[in-house]
Amino acid sequence: MTDNLQNPPRETAVPVLRAGVFMLGAVASFTLMAVAGRQVSFELDTFEIMMFRSFVGLAVVMAFVLVQGRLHELPTRKTGTHLLRNIFHFTGQNLWFFAITMIPLAQVFALEFTTPLWVLILSPLMLGERMTRMRVIAAVLGFVGILIVARPTPETLNIGTAAAAACAIGFAGTYIFAKRLTRTESLACILFYMTVMQAVFGLICAGFDGDIALPSAQSLPWLVAIGICGLTAHFCITSALSLAPATLVSPIDFMRLPVIAIVGLLVYGEAVSIYVFVGAILIFGANYLNLWSETRKS
Protein backbone atom coordinates (compact mmCIF):
# COMPACT_ATOMS: atom_id res chain seq x y z
CA MET A 1 0.00 0.00 0.00
CA THR A 2 2.75 2.45 1.00
CA ASP A 3 4.78 1.62 -2.10
CA ASN A 4 1.77 2.33 -4.30
CA LEU A 5 1.26 5.73 -2.69
CA GLN A 6 4.91 6.71 -3.00
CA ASN A 7 5.34 5.33 -6.53
CA PRO A 8 2.30 6.03 -8.73
CA PRO A 9 1.51 3.35 -11.31
CA ARG A 10 3.59 3.67 -14.45
CA GLU A 11 0.51 3.63 -16.68
CA THR A 12 -0.71 6.79 -14.87
CA ALA A 13 2.60 8.64 -14.60
CA VAL A 14 3.83 8.09 -18.16
CA PRO A 15 0.90 9.80 -19.98
CA VAL A 16 1.18 12.81 -17.65
CA LEU A 17 4.92 13.01 -18.31
CA ARG A 18 4.31 12.78 -22.06
CA ALA A 19 1.68 15.53 -21.78
CA GLY A 20 4.26 17.71 -20.03
CA VAL A 21 6.75 17.13 -22.84
CA PHE A 22 4.12 18.06 -25.44
CA MET A 23 3.32 21.27 -23.53
CA LEU A 24 7.01 22.21 -23.42
CA GLY A 25 6.95 21.76 -27.20
CA ALA A 26 3.96 24.12 -27.39
CA VAL A 27 5.75 26.71 -25.23
CA ALA A 28 8.83 26.53 -27.47
CA SER A 29 6.69 26.78 -30.63
CA PHE A 30 4.73 29.83 -29.47
CA THR A 31 7.93 31.55 -28.32
CA LEU A 32 9.75 30.95 -31.61
CA MET A 33 6.68 32.09 -33.57
CA ALA A 34 6.62 35.39 -31.66
CA VAL A 35 10.31 36.05 -32.32
CA ALA A 36 9.96 35.05 -35.98
CA GLY A 37 6.88 37.25 -36.38
CA ARG A 38 8.70 40.26 -35.04
CA GLN A 39 11.72 39.59 -37.27
CA VAL A 40 9.71 39.47 -40.51
CA SER A 41 7.56 42.45 -39.52
CA PHE A 42 10.37 44.75 -40.63
CA GLU A 43 9.74 43.63 -44.24
CA LEU A 44 6.14 42.38 -44.40
CA ASP A 45 2.81 43.59 -43.07
CA THR A 46 0.55 41.30 -41.04
CA PHE A 47 -1.59 40.29 -44.03
CA GLU A 48 1.50 39.24 -45.98
CA ILE A 49 2.81 37.32 -42.97
CA MET A 50 -0.51 35.48 -42.67
CA MET A 51 -0.56 34.70 -46.40
CA PHE A 52 2.94 33.21 -46.51
CA ARG A 53 2.42 31.44 -43.17
CA SER A 54 -0.71 29.79 -44.56
CA PHE A 55 1.09 28.67 -47.73
CA VAL A 56 3.77 27.00 -45.59
CA GLY A 57 1.12 25.47 -43.36
CA LEU A 58 -0.85 24.17 -46.35
CA ALA A 59 2.27 22.45 -47.72
CA VAL A 60 2.89 20.77 -44.36
CA VAL A 61 -0.75 19.71 -43.95
CA MET A 62 -0.97 18.29 -47.48
CA ALA A 63 2.26 16.35 -46.98
CA PHE A 64 0.82 14.91 -43.77
CA VAL A 65 -2.52 14.06 -45.39
CA LEU A 66 -0.87 12.33 -48.36
CA VAL A 67 1.65 10.38 -46.29
CA GLN A 68 -1.03 9.26 -43.83
CA GLY A 69 -3.54 8.48 -46.59
CA ARG A 70 -6.20 10.82 -45.20
CA LEU A 71 -7.50 12.49 -48.36
CA HIS A 72 -10.88 10.89 -47.70
CA GLU A 73 -11.20 13.01 -44.52
CA LEU A 74 -11.10 16.36 -46.37
CA PRO A 75 -14.64 16.59 -47.86
CA THR A 76 -16.93 18.51 -45.51
CA ARG A 77 -20.54 19.58 -45.10
CA LYS A 78 -19.56 22.22 -42.53
CA THR A 79 -18.11 24.84 -44.89
CA GLY A 80 -19.98 27.66 -43.16
CA THR A 81 -18.66 26.70 -39.72
CA HIS A 82 -15.13 26.39 -41.11
CA LEU A 83 -15.55 29.85 -42.64
CA LEU A 84 -16.71 31.44 -39.37
CA ARG A 85 -13.91 29.75 -37.40
CA ASN A 86 -11.27 31.01 -39.80
CA ILE A 87 -12.62 34.55 -39.95
CA PHE A 88 -12.23 34.70 -36.16
CA HIS A 89 -8.79 33.06 -36.27
CA PHE A 90 -7.50 35.19 -39.15
CA THR A 91 -8.61 38.36 -37.37
CA GLY A 92 -7.16 37.29 -34.02
CA GLN A 93 -3.86 36.17 -35.51
CA ASN A 94 -3.46 39.41 -37.48
CA LEU A 95 -4.03 41.43 -34.33
CA TRP A 96 -1.51 39.20 -32.50
CA PHE A 97 1.19 39.73 -35.13
CA PHE A 98 0.49 43.47 -35.04
CA ALA A 99 0.65 43.57 -31.23
CA ILE A 100 4.05 41.84 -30.99
CA THR A 101 5.56 44.68 -33.02
CA MET A 102 4.07 47.38 -30.80
CA ILE A 103 4.39 46.32 -27.14
CA PRO A 104 6.63 43.99 -25.08
CA LEU A 105 6.18 40.31 -25.95
CA ALA A 106 5.37 39.39 -22.34
CA GLN A 107 2.51 41.89 -22.28
CA VAL A 108 1.07 40.38 -25.48
CA PHE A 109 1.21 36.87 -24.04
CA ALA A 110 -0.34 37.98 -20.74
CA LEU A 111 -3.33 39.53 -22.52
CA GLU A 112 -3.62 36.51 -24.82
CA PHE A 113 -4.16 34.35 -21.72
CA THR A 114 -7.62 35.95 -21.45
CA THR A 115 -8.81 33.81 -24.38
CA PRO A 116 -10.46 31.16 -22.11
CA LEU A 117 -12.33 33.94 -20.30
CA TRP A 118 -13.78 35.18 -23.58
CA VAL A 119 -14.74 31.58 -24.42
CA LEU A 120 -16.51 31.46 -21.06
CA ILE A 121 -18.43 34.68 -21.87
CA LEU A 122 -19.22 33.93 -25.53
CA SER A 123 -20.19 30.26 -25.09
CA PRO A 124 -23.70 31.05 -23.74
CA LEU A 125 -24.31 33.21 -26.82
CA MET A 126 -22.80 30.89 -29.45
CA LEU A 127 -23.17 27.41 -27.94
CA GLY A 128 -26.13 27.91 -25.61
CA GLU A 129 -24.07 26.95 -22.55
CA ARG A 130 -25.22 28.11 -19.11
CA MET A 131 -23.39 30.95 -17.32
CA THR A 132 -22.81 29.64 -13.80
CA ARG A 133 -21.88 31.64 -10.70
CA MET A 134 -18.32 30.24 -10.79
CA ARG A 135 -17.94 31.32 -14.41
CA VAL A 136 -19.04 34.84 -13.51
CA ILE A 137 -16.49 34.96 -10.65
CA ALA A 138 -13.74 33.69 -12.97
CA ALA A 139 -14.64 36.28 -15.61
CA VAL A 140 -14.57 39.15 -13.09
CA LEU A 141 -11.19 38.04 -11.69
CA GLY A 142 -9.81 37.70 -15.21
CA PHE A 143 -10.87 41.16 -16.25
CA VAL A 144 -9.36 42.65 -13.11
CA GLY A 145 -6.17 40.96 -14.29
CA ILE A 146 -6.57 42.59 -17.71
CA LEU A 147 -6.85 46.01 -16.10
CA ILE A 148 -3.67 45.37 -14.09
CA VAL A 149 -1.73 44.25 -17.19
CA ALA A 150 -3.00 47.01 -19.49
CA ARG A 151 -3.26 49.80 -16.86
CA PRO A 152 -5.53 51.81 -19.17
CA THR A 153 -4.47 55.41 -18.66
CA PRO A 154 -3.78 57.99 -21.37
CA GLU A 155 -0.05 57.36 -20.81
CA THR A 156 -0.07 53.55 -20.98
CA LEU A 157 -2.99 52.64 -23.26
CA ASN A 158 -2.05 52.37 -26.94
CA ILE A 159 -3.11 50.60 -30.10
CA GLY A 160 -0.73 47.71 -29.42
CA THR A 161 -2.33 46.98 -26.05
CA ALA A 162 -5.80 47.18 -27.60
CA ALA A 163 -4.76 44.80 -30.39
CA ALA A 164 -3.34 42.27 -27.91
CA ALA A 165 -6.54 42.38 -25.84
CA ALA A 166 -8.75 42.11 -28.93
CA CYS A 167 -6.81 39.18 -30.41
CA ALA A 168 -7.98 37.08 -27.46
CA ILE A 169 -11.60 37.61 -28.58
CA GLY A 170 -10.69 36.34 -32.05
CA PHE A 171 -8.99 33.27 -30.60
CA ALA A 172 -12.02 32.65 -28.36
CA GLY A 173 -14.29 32.56 -31.40
CA THR A 174 -11.83 30.15 -32.98
CA TYR A 175 -12.07 27.74 -30.05
CA ILE A 176 -15.86 27.93 -29.91
CA PHE A 177 -16.33 27.04 -33.58
CA ALA A 178 -13.55 24.43 -33.34
CA LYS A 179 -15.57 22.81 -30.56
CA ARG A 180 -18.49 22.50 -32.98
CA LEU A 181 -16.29 21.12 -35.75
CA THR A 182 -14.56 18.47 -33.65
CA ARG A 183 -17.90 16.71 -33.21
CA THR A 184 -17.87 15.64 -36.87
CA GLU A 185 -14.56 16.71 -38.47
CA SER A 186 -11.07 15.21 -38.16
CA LEU A 187 -8.00 17.24 -37.18
CA ALA A 188 -6.64 16.88 -40.72
CA CYS A 189 -9.87 18.32 -42.15
CA ILE A 190 -9.88 21.28 -39.73
CA LEU A 191 -6.23 22.11 -40.42
CA PHE A 192 -6.70 21.76 -44.19
CA TYR A 193 -9.55 24.27 -44.36
CA MET A 194 -7.74 26.56 -41.91
CA THR A 195 -4.66 26.83 -44.12
CA VAL A 196 -6.63 27.05 -47.39
CA MET A 197 -9.10 29.69 -46.21
CA GLN A 198 -6.50 31.79 -44.44
CA ALA A 199 -4.21 31.68 -47.47
CA VAL A 200 -7.11 33.08 -49.52
CA PHE A 201 -7.93 35.70 -46.86
CA GLY A 202 -4.27 36.71 -46.70
CA LEU A 203 -3.95 36.93 -50.48
CA ILE A 204 -7.05 39.14 -50.75
CA CYS A 205 -6.08 41.44 -47.87
CA ALA A 206 -2.39 41.64 -48.79
CA GLY A 207 -3.20 42.40 -52.42
CA PHE A 208 -5.93 44.93 -51.66
CA ASP A 209 -3.51 47.83 -52.20
CA GLY A 210 -2.12 46.24 -55.37
CA ASP A 211 1.29 45.62 -53.82
CA ILE A 212 2.36 42.32 -52.25
CA ALA A 213 5.90 42.35 -50.90
CA LEU A 214 7.99 39.23 -51.39
CA PRO A 215 10.17 37.99 -48.53
CA SER A 216 13.92 38.35 -48.78
CA ALA A 217 16.30 35.42 -48.40
CA GLN A 218 16.85 36.52 -44.79
CA SER A 219 13.12 36.52 -43.98
CA LEU A 220 12.23 33.25 -45.69
CA PRO A 221 13.49 30.95 -42.87
CA TRP A 222 11.54 33.01 -40.34
CA LEU A 223 8.35 32.61 -42.41
CA VAL A 224 8.88 28.86 -42.61
CA ALA A 225 9.34 28.84 -38.83
CA ILE A 226 6.07 30.76 -38.35
CA GLY A 227 4.16 28.32 -40.56
CA ILE A 228 5.58 25.21 -38.90
CA CYS A 229 5.41 26.53 -35.33
CA GLY A 230 1.78 27.53 -35.72
CA LEU A 231 0.90 23.93 -36.55
CA THR A 232 3.20 22.24 -34.06
CA ALA A 233 1.99 24.42 -31.18
CA HIS A 234 -1.64 23.41 -31.68
CA PHE A 235 -0.67 19.78 -32.33
CA CYS A 236 1.27 19.70 -29.06
CA ILE A 237 -1.60 21.23 -27.07
CA THR A 238 -4.14 18.83 -28.60
CA SER A 239 -1.87 15.86 -27.89
CA ALA A 240 -1.26 16.99 -24.31
CA LEU A 241 -4.99 17.36 -23.63
CA SER A 242 -5.58 13.85 -24.97
CA LEU A 243 -3.09 12.47 -22.41
CA ALA A 244 -3.82 14.50 -19.27
CA PRO A 245 -6.62 16.64 -17.76
CA ALA A 246 -6.74 20.33 -18.61
CA THR A 247 -6.15 21.13 -14.93
CA LEU A 248 -2.67 19.60 -15.27
CA VAL A 249 -1.91 20.91 -18.76
CA SER A 250 -2.97 24.53 -18.16
CA PRO A 251 -0.29 25.42 -15.55
CA ILE A 252 2.47 24.28 -17.94
CA ASP A 253 1.07 26.52 -20.67
CA PHE A 254 1.49 29.45 -18.26
CA MET A 255 5.27 28.91 -18.55
CA ARG A 256 5.03 30.82 -21.83
CA LEU A 257 4.95 34.09 -19.90
CA PRO A 258 8.28 33.87 -18.01
CA VAL A 259 9.93 32.24 -21.05
CA ILE A 260 8.86 35.02 -23.44
CA ALA A 261 9.76 37.65 -20.82
CA ILE A 262 13.32 36.28 -20.67
CA VAL A 263 13.52 36.07 -24.48
CA GLY A 264 12.22 39.64 -24.82
CA LEU A 265 14.79 40.87 -22.30
CA LEU A 266 17.76 39.04 -23.85
CA VAL A 267 16.91 39.52 -27.54
CA TYR A 268 15.17 42.90 -27.58
CA GLY A 269 16.14 44.48 -24.27
CA GLU A 270 12.50 44.69 -23.16
CA ALA A 271 12.02 45.53 -19.51
CA VAL A 272 8.86 43.91 -18.17
CA SER A 273 6.74 45.65 -15.56
CA ILE A 274 5.85 43.73 -12.40
CA TYR A 275 2.22 44.62 -13.18
CA VAL A 276 2.34 42.26 -16.19
CA PHE A 277 3.17 39.30 -13.94
CA VAL A 278 0.71 40.30 -11.21
CA GLY A 279 -2.12 40.68 -13.71
CA ALA A 280 -1.13 37.49 -15.55
CA ILE A 281 -1.18 35.49 -12.31
CA LEU A 282 -4.70 36.77 -11.64
CA ILE A 283 -5.76 35.88 -15.20
CA PHE A 284 -4.26 32.42 -14.85
CA GLY A 285 -5.94 31.97 -11.47
CA ALA A 286 -9.31 32.86 -12.99
CA ASN A 287 -8.78 30.37 -15.83
CA TYR A 288 -7.68 27.64 -13.44
CA LEU A 289 -10.62 28.31 -11.10
CA ASN A 290 -13.02 27.80 -13.99
CA LEU A 291 -11.20 24.64 -15.13
CA TRP A 292 -11.25 23.21 -11.61
CA SER A 293 -14.95 23.97 -11.23
CA GLU A 294 -15.86 22.35 -14.56
CA THR A 295 -13.69 19.29 -13.82
CA ARG A 296 -15.26 18.83 -10.39
CA LYS A 297 -18.76 18.93 -11.89
CA SER A 298 -17.90 16.33 -14.51
Regions picked out by a protein language model, each given a short descriptive name:
Residues 35-38, 46-47, 61, 154-215, ...:
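Transmembrane alpha-helical segments that form core, pore/gating elements
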Residues 134-150, 167, 275-291:
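Hydrophobic transmembrane alpha-helices of multi-pass small-molecule transport proteins
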